[in-house]
Protein backbone atom coordinates (compact mmCIF):
# COMPACT_ATOMS: atom_id res chain seq x y z
CA UNK A 1 0.00 0.00 0.00
CA UNK A 2 1.28 3.45 -0.89
CA UNK A 3 0.01 6.68 0.62
CA UNK A 4 0.50 9.69 -1.60
CA UNK A 5 0.54 13.11 0.02
CA UNK A 6 -0.50 15.83 -2.40
CA UNK A 7 0.00 19.36 -1.22
CA UNK A 8 -0.06 20.71 -4.73
CA UNK A 9 -3.50 19.63 -5.91
CA UNK A 10 -5.36 22.24 -7.92
CA UNK A 11 -8.88 20.78 -7.83
CA UNK A 12 -11.06 23.62 -6.62
CA UNK A 13 -14.38 21.85 -7.20
CA UNK A 14 -16.10 20.44 -4.13
CA UNK A 15 -18.25 17.36 -4.47
CA UNK A 16 -21.64 17.36 -2.79
CA UNK A 17 -20.26 15.04 -0.08
CA UNK A 18 -17.31 17.37 0.58
CA UNK A 19 -19.65 20.35 0.86
CA UNK A 20 -21.75 18.55 3.45
CA UNK A 21 -18.70 17.47 5.47
CA UNK A 22 -17.21 20.95 5.88
CA UNK A 23 -16.75 21.75 9.55
CA UNK A 24 -18.28 24.74 11.28
CA UNK A 25 -14.74 26.12 11.70
CA UNK A 26 -14.24 26.12 7.94
CA UNK A 27 -13.27 29.48 6.57
CA UNK A 28 -15.07 30.43 3.38
CA UNK A 29 -12.96 30.47 0.25
CA UNK A 30 -14.06 34.03 -0.55
CA UNK A 31 -12.04 35.30 2.41
CA UNK A 32 -8.81 33.95 0.92
CA UNK A 33 -6.83 34.77 -2.20
CA UNK A 34 -4.80 32.20 -4.13
CA UNK A 35 -1.02 32.49 -3.95
CA UNK A 36 0.36 32.68 -7.48
CA UNK A 37 2.75 29.78 -7.80
CA UNK A 38 4.52 28.12 -10.70
CA UNK A 39 4.77 24.80 -8.86
CA UNK A 40 1.03 24.29 -8.45
CA UNK A 41 1.06 24.61 -4.65
CA UNK A 42 -2.56 25.09 -3.60
CA UNK A 43 -1.92 27.78 -0.99
CA UNK A 44 -4.29 30.66 -0.22
CA UNK A 45 -3.89 33.66 2.07
CA UNK A 46 -5.48 36.64 3.78
CA UNK A 47 -3.88 39.69 5.40
CA UNK A 48 -4.48 40.41 9.09
CA UNK A 49 -3.85 43.49 11.20
CA UNK A 50 -2.67 43.48 14.83
CA UNK A 51 -6.26 42.74 15.97
CA UNK A 52 -6.58 39.80 13.55
CA UNK A 53 -9.01 41.79 11.40
CA UNK A 54 -8.75 41.18 7.67
CA UNK A 55 -6.94 43.85 5.63
CA UNK A 56 -7.64 44.57 1.95
CA UNK A 57 -5.44 42.63 -0.45
CA UNK A 58 -4.71 45.81 -2.39
CA UNK A 59 -2.65 47.19 0.51
CA UNK A 60 -0.07 44.40 0.20
CA UNK A 61 3.32 45.55 -1.08
CA UNK A 62 5.39 42.47 -0.20
CA UNK A 63 4.25 38.86 0.25
CA UNK A 64 5.83 36.85 3.05
CA UNK A 65 8.78 34.87 1.74
CA UNK A 66 9.65 31.32 2.66
CA UNK A 67 13.44 30.72 2.53
CA UNK A 68 14.11 29.45 -0.99
CA UNK A 69 10.60 30.22 -2.22
CA UNK A 70 7.46 28.13 -2.56
CA UNK A 71 9.28 25.23 -4.22
CA UNK A 72 11.36 24.95 -1.06
CA UNK A 73 8.21 25.04 1.08
CA UNK A 74 6.73 22.17 -0.92
CA UNK A 75 9.94 20.15 -0.55
CA UNK A 76 10.13 20.97 3.17
CA UNK A 77 6.61 19.65 3.76
CA UNK A 78 7.22 16.49 1.73
CA UNK A 79 10.53 15.79 3.53
CA UNK A 80 9.17 16.45 7.01
CA UNK A 81 5.76 14.82 6.77
CA UNK A 82 5.83 11.72 8.97
CA UNK A 83 3.10 9.14 8.71
CA UNK A 84 2.87 5.74 10.35
CA UNK A 85 3.22 3.19 7.54
CA UNK A 86 1.66 0.34 9.54
CA UNK A 87 -1.92 1.06 8.52
CA UNK A 88 -3.60 -1.48 6.29
CA UNK A 89 -6.81 0.38 5.53
CA UNK A 90 -7.13 2.52 2.44
CA UNK A 91 -8.11 6.12 2.92
CA UNK A 92 -8.58 9.00 0.53
CA UNK A 93 -9.40 12.49 1.64
CA UNK A 94 -8.27 15.93 2.62
CA UNK A 95 -7.00 17.75 5.69
CA UNK A 96 -7.28 21.54 5.54
CA UNK A 97 -5.09 23.58 7.80
CA UNK A 98 -4.49 27.23 8.51
CA UNK A 99 -1.47 28.92 9.98
CA UNK A 100 -0.31 32.49 10.45
CA UNK A 101 3.06 33.99 9.53
CA UNK A 102 3.30 36.77 12.11
CA UNK A 103 5.09 40.13 11.86
CA UNK A 104 8.34 38.49 12.98
CA UNK A 105 8.06 35.74 10.34
CA UNK A 106 7.17 33.03 12.87
CA UNK A 107 4.60 30.34 12.06
CA UNK A 108 1.89 30.57 14.73
CA UNK A 109 -1.82 29.84 15.31
CA UNK A 110 -1.85 26.49 13.52
CA UNK A 111 -5.32 24.99 13.16
CA UNK A 112 -6.81 21.97 11.44
CA UNK A 113 -10.06 23.34 10.00
CA UNK A 114 -11.17 20.28 8.03
CA UNK A 115 -10.36 16.92 9.54
CA UNK A 116 -9.85 13.51 7.97
CA UNK A 117 -8.75 11.21 10.78
CA UNK A 118 -6.84 11.92 13.99
CA UNK A 119 -3.52 10.39 12.85
CA UNK A 120 -3.58 12.27 9.54
CA UNK A 121 -4.67 15.51 11.24
CA UNK A 122 -1.87 15.20 13.81
CA UNK A 123 0.77 14.49 11.17
CA UNK A 124 -0.28 17.61 9.21
CA UNK A 125 -0.22 19.74 12.36
CA UNK A 126 3.26 18.49 13.26
CA UNK A 127 4.78 19.25 9.87
CA UNK A 128 3.36 22.79 9.88
CA UNK A 129 4.72 23.36 13.39
CA UNK A 130 8.23 22.60 12.05
CA UNK A 131 8.10 25.18 9.24
CA UNK A 132 11.02 27.61 9.71
CA UNK A 133 10.74 31.40 9.87
CA UNK A 134 9.67 33.43 6.84
CA UNK A 135 10.36 37.03 5.89
CA UNK A 136 7.14 38.78 6.98
CA UNK A 137 4.65 40.47 4.66
CA UNK A 138 4.48 44.25 4.32
CA UNK A 139 1.83 46.80 3.41
CA UNK A 140 2.23 50.52 2.65
CA UNK A 141 4.97 52.39 4.57
CA UNK A 142 6.88 49.12 5.08
CA UNK A 143 4.51 48.10 7.89
CA UNK A 144 4.76 44.40 8.65
CA UNK A 145 1.48 42.47 8.81
CA UNK A 146 0.36 38.96 9.62
CA UNK A 147 -0.68 36.61 6.85
CA UNK A 148 -3.02 33.69 7.42
CA UNK A 149 -2.52 30.78 5.02
CA UNK A 150 -4.94 28.02 4.07
CA UNK A 151 -3.05 24.83 3.17
CA UNK A 152 -4.87 21.65 2.11
CA UNK A 153 -3.23 18.23 2.25
CA UNK A 154 -4.78 15.65 -0.05
CA UNK A 155 -4.23 11.95 0.60
CA UNK A 156 -4.61 9.30 -2.07
CA UNK A 157 -4.03 5.65 -1.17
CA UNK A 158 -3.33 3.03 -3.79
CA UNK A 159 -2.59 -0.67 -3.56
Which ranges hold each PLM region?
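Charge-biased low-complexity segments
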Residues: 10-159
Amino acid sequence: MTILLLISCKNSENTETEKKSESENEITQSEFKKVESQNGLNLEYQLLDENNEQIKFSSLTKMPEFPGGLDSLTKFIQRNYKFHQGFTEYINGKVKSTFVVDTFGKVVDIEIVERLRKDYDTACYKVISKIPDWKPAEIENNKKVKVKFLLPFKFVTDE
